Amino acid sequence: MSNFIVGLTGGIASGKSALAAEFEKLGVPVVDADVVARQVVAPGLILDAITNRFGQGILLPDGTLDRQALRKIVFADPTERRALEAITHPAIRTELQRAAKAANHPYAIVAIPLLAEAGARATYPWLDRILVVDVPVALQHARLMQRDGSTSALAGQMIAAQASRAQRLAIADDVVSNEGNTDQLAQQAQRLDATYRAALQTHRIEN
């Protein structure tokens, strides 16, 4: 059971998944908010609530969620998007905390791409540390164009739609710079792993 939880976040194309993978190599369990978000909308109470709000048109013939149909609705209207978030986000947060605490390791990492946008510790008060993967905006832009084949304009729009680099750094307890190569990222993960294991001792004494 994990009694120490680290929230991992970063902007688009910053290398969140790469850093999470380095922690996993060290045996640290990583709970991914994107995966949990997909699990939460499986057939059940949450999907029933979504269907009641948005209608049967957001279901596929087999009764599962038609993500594309729902996406069209919520992206076209901010009010509808907020209505969806009001249904799904509390369930996602609850499951993230449950899964992290249930992990069979001294500490766990919860990967939350939009942690800054969601309110950081005001929304996730159970996070013991917040770790931000940081890259310059110009590098984010270049990676998006290379990775996804995005146009320069689209890459700029995607970056602008998220919290700013300064806003993410403002919520950080720890920062990993991902301007270098995989070896450098691995070294930073190893350093932080040692830091978190040491912090666990203090955490246990205080609690």
Curated annotation (Swiss-Prot):
* Keyword Repeat attached: no
Q: Where is the DPCK domain positioned along the sequence?
A: 5-207
Q: Which residues bind ATP?
A: A13, S14, G15, K16, S17, A18
Keyword tags = ATP-binding, Coenzyme A biosynthesis, Cytoplasm, Kinase, Nucleotide-binding, Transferase
Q: In which pathway does it act?
A: Cofactor biosynthesis; coenzyme A biosynthesis; CoA from (R)-pantothenate: step 5/5
Q: Which InterPro entries match?
A: Depp_CoAkinase, P-loop_NTPase
SUPFAM superfamilies listed in its UniProt record: P-loop containing nucleoside triphosphate hydrolases
User: What domain of life does the native source organism fall in?
Assistant: Bacteria
Q: What is its EC number?
A: 2.7.1.24
Share an example GO biological-process annotation for this protein. Answer: coenzyme A biosynthetic process
| A Pfam cross-reference name | CoaE
Q: What class of enzyme is it?
A: transferase
Per the record, its GO cellular-component terms are:
cytoplasm
Q: Where in the cell is it found?
A: Cytoplasm
Principal location listed in the UniProt entry: cytoplasm
Q: Which reaction does it catalyse?
A: 3'-dephospho-CoA + ATP = ADP + CoA + H(+)
Alphabetically, the GO molecular function entries are: ATP binding; dephospho-CoA kinase activity
Q: Which NCBIfam families match?
A: dephospho-CoA kinase
What protein family does this chain belong to?
Belongs to the CoaE family.
What's this chain's function?
Catalyzes the phosphorylation of the 3'-hydroxyl group of dephosphocoenzyme A to form coenzyme A.
Q: What is this protein called?
A: Dephospho-CoA kinase
| Top-level taxonomy | Bacteria, Pseudomonadati, Pseudomonadota, Gammaproteobacteria, Lysobacterales
